[in-house]
UniProtKB/Swiss-Prot annotation:
GO biological process annotation, one example: translation
One Pfam family hit: Ribosomal_L29
Name the UniProt record assigns to this protein: Large ribosomal subunit protein uL29
PANTHER family: 60S RIBOSOMAL PROTEIN L35/50S RIBOSOMAL PROTEIN L29, LARGE RIBOSOMAL SUBUNIT PROTEIN UL29C
Family from the record: Belongs to the universal ribosomal protein uL29 family.
Gene assigned in the entry: rpmC
Length: 63
């Protein structure tokens, strides 16, 4: 997910994307806690995608 792709979305779409990412992060954290997560890099990717979405939301709020 690129920041430019996120900037082209409206606030409602960004909030929906944020909710999806937070749900995915929760699932990955539960898998990691139970030892079922094989691809641990996914946690880092999701965390950074959440940060990207939040950054774009803050930029749009400032406009």
């Amino acid at each position: 997910m690129k920041a430019q792709e996120l900037r082209n979305k409206n606030v409602e779409e960004l909030n929906a994307e944020l909710n999806n990412l937070l749900g995915e992060q929760f699932k990955l954290r539960m898998q990691a806690a139970t030892g079922q997560l094989q691809q641990t890099h996914q946690l880092k990717q999701v965390r950074r995608n959440i940060a990207r979405v939040k950054t774009v939301l803050n930029q749009k709020a400032g406009e």
